Amino acid sequence: MASVQLSSRDISVFSNEYKERRRLQMMRFFGATAFTLISARLAFRGVQSRKYVPNMFQLNHKPPTYSFQGEAVSALAFGTGLATGTFSMLVFGTCWVWDISSLAEFTLKMKKLMGEPVTDQALLENTPMDEDTRKVAEALEDMLKGSRKD
């Protein structure tokens, strides 16, 4: 199982790396926004095209025939486009505001937000052990060293 290593260095606001990272986050959000707006426009046109406006001397209580299957497919497509666009805008906008570029960064920010201290391997190694834990660790090390000699 591979672990993701994140550097704890602060990225300068004026560095090219920071500017490129923020630009990428902005472009993702604007792409999701454009997708949502296009989906909304297509859905609006789809609804408007189904509106029945009778001509002169046509009955206004008999709408034209239509395919239920075609209506269902178009409704599913429009609904999926709108839901996907809105959800992606929410995700990319939140990541842009919180300056998150990867899933590992999101995990660390959520842990910090929920009050869990962010642990580092060096911090764990330098933590003093109590007496019982030290005895168990020494016994395990001795057992492993003994099995390697055989």
Swiss-Prot record:
The chain crosses the membrane at residues 29-48, 76-98. Its main location: membrane. It is a multi-pass membrane protein. GO terms for cellular component: membrane; mitochondrion. Keywords: Membrane, Transmembrane, Transmembrane helix. It is found in: Membrane. Coiled coil: none annotated. PANTHER family: ALTERED INHERITANCE OF MITOCHONDRIA PROTEIN 11. Belongs to the AIM11 family. This is Altered inheritance of mitochondria protein 11. It comes from Lachancea thermotolerans (strain ATCC 56472 / CBS 6340 / NRRL Y-8284) (Yeast). The gene is AIM11.
